[in-house]
């Protein structure tokens, strides 16, 4: 049995290697996508244009504005002479934020009265607006503390000291890049297997495969192993780029990583083989792959926390292997998790993998003729 399966595996690898378009799709784009997404997909603010409408010539206003200018998150676009200039700048997106300091800002602070400070933010992008508000709140809090210390005022009764574990500088890239590792591994593996049988049908060689001594289960195994091998190699290459190019720390156990990777590949291989069993042409295989990939990524917690989703949608995520693999990746990269701690993520993927492969085998037997 196994020598026939190995022969079919070799045939599959040769077919992939001979296909120039396939080589380019499965090797080049994932690497390029990782590098592009690693730099472009970030929640950090950098060089956000803002304008200042300052009606106060006092020292406090100057000190506060110096703090804002010194932050790499902001870029001063200009000073305004009147409030009528605010709306045109925000309407045309020349600035995303306007700081308005009233004429009595310094006087109010010296007299220990509340000193209003207006921050006008472009709210069309709610995520950026919330980040801007958070950045400004942090700058203002530090300014208030240092102003009180410099003037000898009594400190506030409670002081917030924040310490971030696992990601001390709160770099969003440390969160996003491990997720991209899982995303690209999913895309490549599903596409390789989704096109495997469809490619044979389109080329007219699938009928020849059926008259060989190979049994259906042997054909299925021969189609599955190349996808697992390519997914494994692709994942390792992407992990190396994440660690050595983006300097994302890999603190966890490699054994725990490869257990999770193997179970994840089994889960998505089953989906790919189901799609390939149904598809008659490669175009149908591609379409079926994308129909699976889009909800799988959205419901994985890659960009939005699963806890923020409606309860019904949260139940749907329980059958998504990507959900569990992302937890494994981020735990191993940032937390230094072990296989024992990740057991709650392993067993659901194992069950999903067994069910998917069983369904793929059933579909394959009923669709092979």
Where do the PLM segments sit?
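Extracytoplasmic/periplasmic domains immediately adjacent to an N-terminal transmembrane anchor
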Residues: 1-174, 341
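Transmembrane helix boundary and interhelical loop/hinge segments in multi-pass membrane proteins
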Residues: 16, 20, 190-214, 224, ...
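Transmembrane helix segments
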Residues: 28, 36-45, 280-322
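Short helix-capping/hinge motifs at transmembrane helix termini and TM-loop junctions
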Residues: 40-44, 194, 198-199, 212, ...
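Membrane-interfacial helix-loop-helix junctions in multi-pass membrane proteins
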Residues: 166-170, 249, 301-356, 363
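Long, hydrophobic alpha-helical segments
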Residues: 176-193
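Alpha-helical transmembrane segments and their short interhelical loops
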Residues: 216-289, 294, 340-346, 350, ...
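Short cytosolic juxtamembrane segments of multi-pass membrane proteins
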Residues: 362-369
